[in-house]
């Protein structure tokens, strides 16, 4: 069992013309963004479930190692990958991220200082590079959470088509589980959704806890 405390302060939106303030509004809810989580000292092989402020947020969490089924081509390290959603509309997930080396764990996305030894989903050794039969896609979760609605953002769902923008490679998301690796750690990204619709939960600004429970 592990957890991460996330602190998001209240914000004000202000528009000024010369020295005169024309609007000033309290922003009571958290803005949409991705947050990286890196939990350690967990039980290897355990599937855990994420909660934020006591609410199940499994659908908004993406593991660093995404389980995929390749459909064409081979992904390349450093390229951007985008999602093709299963459905249209405001409820459809949108995802845009950078591909890290397949066994990357810590360090630069293309030059890891620590690597994964095994695939946490099947216990097999992880290859040193991507190929046409790769079963995981390693996402650079650091850049994904680097800034509020920056270049990279979003979340995915099972069945989503992922497309490499440089390689043209395609794969479908075969499963989305948070499983502790053999080194007792788990890395992933939590997406705080847009608050413009009641379809997604809203989280008040302030001190909120992100927890993982088995």
Q: Could you say what each language-model-derived stretch is?
A:
Residues 1-214:
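Extracytoplasmic/secretory-pathway segments with low complexity and glycosylation-like composition
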């Amino acid at each position: 069992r592990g957890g991460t405390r996330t602190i998001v302060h209240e914000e004000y939106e202000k528009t000024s013309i010369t020295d005169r303030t024309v609007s000033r509004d309290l922003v009571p809810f958290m803005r949409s963004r991705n947050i990286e989580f890196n939990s350690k000292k967990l039980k290897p092989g355990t599937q855990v479930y994420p909660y934020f402020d006591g609410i199940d947020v499994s659908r908004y969490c993406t593991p660093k190692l995404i389980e995929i089924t390749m459909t064409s081509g081979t992904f390349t390290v450093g390229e951007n990958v985008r999602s093709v959603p299963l459905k249209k509309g405001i409820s459809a997930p949108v995802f845009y991220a950078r591909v890290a080396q397949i066994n990357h764990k810590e360090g630069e996305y293309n030059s890891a200082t620590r690597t994964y030894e095994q695939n946490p989903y099947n216990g097999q050794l992880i290859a040193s590079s991507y190929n046409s039969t790769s079963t995981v896609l390693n996402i650079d979760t650091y850049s994904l959470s680097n800034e509020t609605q920056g270049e990279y953002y979003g979340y995915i769902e099972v069945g989503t088509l992922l497309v490499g923008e440089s390689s043209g490679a395609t794969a479908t998301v075969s499963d989305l589980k948070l499983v502790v690796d053999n080194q007792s750690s788990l890395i992933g990204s939590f997406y705080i959704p847009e608050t413009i619709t009641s379809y997604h939960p809203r989280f008040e600004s302030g001190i909120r806890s992100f927890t993982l429970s088995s």
